[in-house]
Amino acid sequence: MVIDEPHGPPKASVVAGALINPVNVNRCTMVADHQHYIAAALETYRSMEETLGISLLEAMQMFVFHKDETKRQLYNEKQLQLPAYIQQLTNAEITLTQQFFRNKYGIAKVGPVWKIHATQLLSAWSSFLKNKGLLLQEQFNIAECGIRPESVQYKTISAGKIIFCEGAAGMHNSFFKNLPFTKNRGEALLLSVPDLPAEYVYHYSIRLVPAAEGLFWCGSNYKWQFNNLLPDQNWRMQTEATLRQWLRLPFKVVDHVVAERPTTAGQQFLAGTHPAMPSVAIFNGLGTKGFSCGPALALDLCRHLTDPDQPASSRALH
């Protein structure tokens, strides 16, 4: 049974660009354990496509625009070391990028990357659970939850385990007050760029990811000190200025979205059971890695819950 408030605070999963990418494009290095996480993610989303009868995954190439000569040289060196992931553009791709973008230091091609149709996934999965009688759309009230080491009772629902997947709100959960939660907010713009080809992801100091037809997700920023989740107008103006310098095409801002990310000190994932209350588990702290690392971590947690001898993914809980 899933309990989820339908109209709560903005969820980071809704604001996310939802991209699976094996390469850290800023450092030009491979993401740690990328083969393990990506294999599990692709298998999970393909299985969900079959279950839901919709398309959720789309393989793409990412064009990485170099900001300076140092970054260009770094990518040229890495291309020789990582030819399966970093390539030169074809003549047709060079012509395409020159038509739509201004660029001084060249471009590398990273791929494949996978775009997840996050909005469709979340909506379809919610409907699937609801039709199965497995979704309770209300605010969870922990005061009404009776939790014992061997069982959990919430209103009329009896269970052996409760898994808290609260995102940024997890830092206020008394069971996990000693975990190293930190605050981080991110925001993105939804842009209308009708003539920009939607078969690619474009990365500069900001990233453009195809969304709905003619629309692109543009983001994202990271802010560690904040008092609210209101759109940052200064960031928006700076981003629009960067877009005007980078894009040769006109664009229009359709929306400006903000959400608080569930992050931890050291960017450590939290997936495991409470050391003193084995019926209580947590799945949190994935930050910007939720769509890419979440499936593998969730599978590990499920194995641990059904067989406690199986290790959990988070060292912070044990």
Cite the ranges covered by each PLM segment.
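A short, glycine/Asx- and small/polar-enriched loop/turn
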Residues: 103, 147-153, 157-158, 263-268, ...
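Dinucleotide-binding Rossmann-like beta1-alpha1 core, especially the glycine-rich loop
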Residues: 18-99
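Glycine-rich FAD pyrophosphate-binding loop
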Residues: 1-14
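Helical element adjacent to the flavin cofactor pocket in flavoenzyme catalytic cores
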Residues: 108-161, 165
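Short beta-strand to alpha-helix junction loop
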Residues: 28-40, 108-124, 230-234, 292
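Flavin-binding catalytic cores
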Residues: 194-196, 213-215, 223-266, 273-277
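C-terminal catalytic lobe of FAD-dependent flavoproteins
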Residues: 252-318
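Central helical "cap/lid" subdomain
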Residues: 152-202, 223, 229-232, 246-251
